[in-house]
Amino acid sequence: MENLTLKGKVILEGIIELETGMHIGGTKETLKIGGTDNPVIRDAFGRILIPGSSLKGKIRALLERKDGKYKEDGRGNYLPHDCGECEICKIFGPHDSKNIKEPVRVIVRDAYLQPEENKKDYDYLEIKVENTIDRLKGTTIKGGIRNMERVVAGSKFKFEVVFNIYKESDKELIKKFIEGMKLLEDDYLGGSGSRGYGKIKFRDIKLICKPKEYYEGNENSKKESDEVESLNELESELDKIWGGINFN
């Protein structure tokens, strides 16, 4: 692996707003009477979240699909790219750790539901009943009814993505990640996307630049962008803060 020096960090934060109900599956409530067949994922304290791994994995998969950067394993499975040298591998890391040539750039935090005042997480849940139809009879197949727990449309999650900066060219890697976020807005997050689940929008987005001098005690070296409502506005905000990092 190339020996690179950390120049700073760029933090991307904002809100993920659900435009349709979303289901990211959790552990089945097998011991609960009346528990749903397919609950949404929660942490150990019962809080509803979008796992960072789900957000990161979806954005990576969309970028790989767009660029044709995936491999077939001979058994009909399509695996993540792992050359270790392209933009996608630099951002997310290669699939095979033996091919790591540079430090992985991105950290994607878990995104937690942000309830409004006087509301609890469970106020943002709904049960959607789905069924499987007999193609000849036009009726529900026996055993074909299932209950899906969803986080309701309009729910908001606070997200944070951290980019470790080593080179001046890492600016292009941040732009590449933002490209993946744009693809996600026109795709879906979680399961059952073809049934209309998981349409999302990124809102209230801003960038925070913390050069290495910030971590050495110079708090005034931190720069923040304006908060924007669209990913299309984010690239110009990146240009404004990028000068805060010293690459000499």
From Swiss-Prot:
UniProt GO BP: defense response to virus
Check the record and name the InterPro entries matching this protein: CRISPR-assoc_RAMP_Csm3, CRISPR_Csm3_endoribonuclease, RAMP_III_fam
Q: Which keywords accompany this UniProt record? A: Antiviral defense, Endonuclease, Hydrolase, Metal-binding, Nuclease, RNA-binding, Zinc
* Chain positions recorded as Zn(2+) binding sites: H81, C83, C89
Residues in the signal sequence: none
Q: What is its EC number?
A: 3.1.-.-
Q: Which GO terms describe its molecular function?
A: endonuclease activity; metal ion binding; RNA binding
Q: In the UniProt annotation, what is the result of changing E216A?
A: Wild-type interaction with Csm4
Question: What domain of life is recorded for the organism?
Answer: Archaea
Its biological function?
Answer: CRISPR (clustered regularly interspaced short palindromic repeat) is an adaptive immune system that provides protection against mobile genetic elements (viruses, transposable elements and conjugative plasmids). CRISPR clusters contain spacers, sequences complementary to antecedent mobile elements, and target invading nucleic acids. CRISPR clusters are transcribed and processed into CRISPR RNA (crRNA). This subunit has the target ssRNA endonuclease activity; it cleaves multiple sites in the target RNA at 6 nucleotide intervals. The Csm3-Csm4 complex binds both crRNA and a non-specific RNA; Csm3 alone was not seen to bind RNA.
Family label = Belongs to the CRISPR-associated Csm3 family.
* Record note on quaternary structure: Part of the Csm effector complex that includes Cas10, Csm2, Csm3, Csm4 and Csm5. Stable Csm3-Csm4 (which crystallizes as 2 heterodimers) and Cas10-Csm1-Csm3-Csm4 subcomplexes can be isolated; Cas10 and Csm3 probably do not directly interact.
Q: What else is known?
A: Encoded in a type III-A CRISPR locus.
The protein depicted here goes by the name CRISPR system Cms endoribonuclease Csm3
